[in-house]
Amino acid sequence: MKIIELILDEEQDDIGVDAISIVESPAIESDFVALKNQEIKLAEVDKEKKILMGALLIPNKPIYRNGGEGEYYIFFSKDTIVKASQMFLQNGKQSNSTLEHNQALNGLTLVESWIVESKEQDKSAMYGLDVPVGTWMGSVKVNNDDVWNEYVKTNKVKGFSI
C-alpha cells in the first residue's frame, strides 16, 4: 500500500491544522487523559479541571486513509509536526474544535502545547502516556458542560484528531 509523507508550507495560509477534533477512535491510536483536580487546601474540593491531555500528532506514525485515490497511509515527520504546531498557534486557532471532524464545538481551547523532547522526562510520561520523541502534545480546556458530560465522561470520545 502507498505511504505518503505530508509536508506543510509555511507560506501557504490555507494549509495546516485548522482544528483539533475530539473523536472516539483517534487515527494516531493514542487516547487522551481527562485530568481532574486533586484535593487542594483553601480551594473547593472535587471540582473538575475539565482538561484533556493527549497526543495531537505522532511522528512517522502511519495513518490509514481510504479516499478517492484508494487505500493508502500518510505520516508526518518530526519537522512537519513542529511546523504544524507552530502554525496552529500563530494562526490563532487555539479555540477551533470539532466533534468527529463534523460538528463545530464551542468552549474548547488548547491551553498547552509542546513537542516531546524526552520520553522519560516529559509531562506525558507522568500521566502514563508512552509517546515517541517529536510527538505534538496538547491540553484542551473544556468549558462546555454538554461536551464534558455527554462525550468525555461517558467515554464516547477517547482522543484527538487533526
Tell where the protein language model's regions lie, with residue ranges:
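Signature of dsDNA virion morphogenesis modules
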Residues: M1-I162
